[in-house]
Amino acid sequence: MLSDKYSSGKKHGRTFTIIFCSFFLAFILLLFTPSLISEEEIDTGWDQAPISTDNDLNDVLALNSTSAFAIGENGKIYHTVNSGVNWSEQDSGVIQDLNAIEFNGQAIVVGDSGTVLINDGDSWIGNSIEGAGNLYDLSVPHFESLADSVIFVSGTGGEIWKWSDNTWDDLSNFTGTTNDIYAIDFVNENEGFAVGADGLIIATIDGGLSWEIRDSPEEFRGFSFYDVTIFGYKGPSDDEASPVSVLIVGENGTVIQSSGTGPTA
């Protein structure tokens, strides 16, 4: 009958409308409703440290299993004594960006405009370099006290400075480069490497009084190198007191390792 067909058509129309509305509502819910599994419920194995700052943090150093420092922009220094559960801000006494921190008996920090800070336990002592540019890295082969220590720092425009005998000596004229030097590492008071912009690798065996350029692989000479470490070092009690290998990392995933031994690697 016509009424039956009309009734059947209405049913089909209602069914289509219900299905369409259901899909439309589901789409809206998926679009605007947060995921049922929140980020907090996903265990990534990482927790955010409770440091309240918007400043970039440029370096971090663990002194032992419980104590660590984090440093960064605008002279910010943070310290934890309970394995990162709590962090307290320390007064650095400076507003310059801090770029690197090292420890050899005492924590030492370098930063922009020649900033050098030394931790004496409860506070930071300024030992900055007048006239120096931005300092990017440091190496501390010897530290007994400020008066009895050897510290090397590197920075902009080929700058390398050495602290010894209670004074800073400018070694920049000996580096043979005006490239920024981003990293420096010494295994003792005499032997060290420094790396920087445009594939720069230089080495010294006389405490920085002279530096020799080390050829980097040709394909990496346009890249900047950001860090260097000397490992496998043989100490004075061994037959050959020289670095065994040098590892350098840098731009575009660069990782290169010396294939020779000793300071001529």
Residues covered by each model-derived region:
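Secretory targeting signatures
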Residues: 1-40
